Regions:
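Two-component system phosphorelay core
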Residues: 1-120
Length: 120
């Protein structure tokens, strides 16, 4: 049976997050707030860097987003950011654009989950 928890577990690995934070909800809240605050800025900058074909900036921003996604235990977003970083390192604009689209989808899913959770 598919549940909201099982769907959200594929977006953010709550088991890993609880282990990382020893279940401390205050720390988790700080992590969520940090992602909400910094994530959109990184995505806006990343969108411009991809549009301009600025590989060094794409690599740097994908790395930064990967770091905040990893802290949040958003594993699919983390993996997509790593793939984007590698595509930028290879100067492969077609791959960069393709993977950026996946990063954007994963990012939006994380944001929707966090925003929904903050309404509860």
């Amino acid at each position: 049976m598919i549940t909201l928890h099982s769907i959200s577990q594929t977006i953010i690995n709550y088991d890993a997050l609880n282990e990382l934070t020893d279940g401390d909800e205050a720390i988790q809240s700080l992590i969520f707030e940090g992602f909400l605050k910094d994530g959109q800025t990184r995505m806006d900058e990343l969108e411009l860097a991809v549009a301009w074909g600025d590989f060094s900036q794409v690599k740097l921003l994908a790395h930064a987003l990967k770091g905040i996604a990893r802290t949040l235990c958003a594993e699919r977003l983390t993996d997509q950011c790593l793939t984007l970083e590698e595509a930028a390192l290879a100067n492969d604009i077609a791959k960069v654009k393709e993977v950026y689209a996946h990063v954007s989808i994963e990012y939006k899913q994380v944001m929707q989950l966090l925003n929904h959770g903050s309404e509860d």
